Amino acid sequence: MGVTMSKLPTEREVLRCIYEMYESSYPGIPAGETRGDNDPYLSIDVKAVAEKLACKPELLFGYLYYHLDAKHRYKQGEGASVHLFALKVGEKRHGVNFPYLSALLANHDLEHRRQLWSVGLSMLALVLSAAAIVAQVVTAK
């Protein structure tokens, strides 16, 4: 049974979906320990995330690996690369740098709120302008 795609998910939608699906798993606490490992990477199930986003797993993998990781990858002072998404990190397959993903999502959410405020204020200005025109037309008669 294939996945029906209505539209491709946005970067914000992909990050939000992964965050919501795996937030309770971070940090991973091994049985018998009180503190989780200081490992920022969580293994994700690309197929499950794709299913939740109603897109094909192959497209989601490509989006994560070829676009988002390339877009957000950076080098630290020592030359080590920090990845958002890695094919394999230690024993983990399809590893996502969860703290980094969380920070990127927070920035996307902030930008989204700013855009909503801008659109809302623009709509309010438009309504007030229309009301002023109507008031002028009514009082001019």
Which stretches of residues belong to each language-model region?
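N-terminal extramembrane/targeting module of integral membrane proteins
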Residues: 1-43
